[in-house]
Amino acid sequence: MDTDKDKIFLDSQERMVKAITSLEKEFTKLRTGRASTSIVDTIKVDYYGTPTPINQLASIAIPDSSSITIQPWDKTAFNPIEKAILKSELGLTPINDGKIIRITLPPLTEDRRKDLVKLARKYGEDTKIAIRNIRRDANEQLKRLEKNKFISEDELKGFTEDIQKMTDNYIKEVETHCKTKEKEIIEI
């Protein structure tokens, strides 16, 4: 029955890693004061009637810390990309010179920075809750194994401690990610 315990442990670890990966993805979407391709990556463009992500229609570059350039591969994509950026709720104003679309990111206001920090903390807290729920699921599965006499009470205690150590490590990782993101947001 070692395989059941191992499966529970590995499954929990895999799910916790996915939770952290999801947090990292959410953090890339949060605008800090620096330009990032992830700010516009998810904007969908109505391209020949099909909603298409910008990164599938153009090259996106970061020439400096406060601007993004978008160079569509197809000349007919300029106007749809520009419209999609204006329609997005990002508050960005694209400048189309016919060869390239430039977006200059306005500096973040103090209030906007505070809102972004709150949002980052919320994402972090949601991830911690997800990790704790994974721990709870693993502990319940281990208790069932013990109840059905597949593992002893001592083994249950040891495996529960292992799951707790893993949980603590991933919670610390979440806290590190949150602190790093908060510093990025607050930096002017």
Curated annotation (Swiss-Prot):
One molecular function GO term is: ribosomal large subunit binding
The UniProt entry, under SUPFAM superfamilies, shows: Ribosome recycling factor, RRF
Intracellular or extracellular location(s)? Cytoplasm
Q: Does the keyword Cytoplasm apply?
A: yes
What does UniProt give as GO cellular component? cytoplasm
Origin: domain of life: Bacteria
What InterPro entries does UniProt report for this protein, alphabetically?
Answer: Ribosome_recyc_fac, Ribosome_recyc_fac_dom, RRF_sf
Q: Which UniProt keywords apply?
A: Cytoplasm, Protein biosynthesis
Primary location recorded for the protein, binned into one broad class:
cytoplasm
| Biological process according to GO | translational termination
Q: Which CDD domains match?
A: RRF
What does it do?
Responsible for the release of ribosomes from messenger RNA at the termination of protein biosynthesis. May increase the efficiency of translation by recycling ribosomes from one round of translation to another.
* PANTHER family from the UniProt entry: MITOCHONDRIAL RIBOSOME RECYCLING FACTOR PSEUDO 1, RIBOSOME RECYCLING FACTOR
- Similarity comment: Belongs to the RRF family.
Q: What's the protein called, per UniProt?
A: Ribosome-recycling factor
Species whose genome carries this gene: Lawsonia intracellularis (strain PHE/MN1-00)
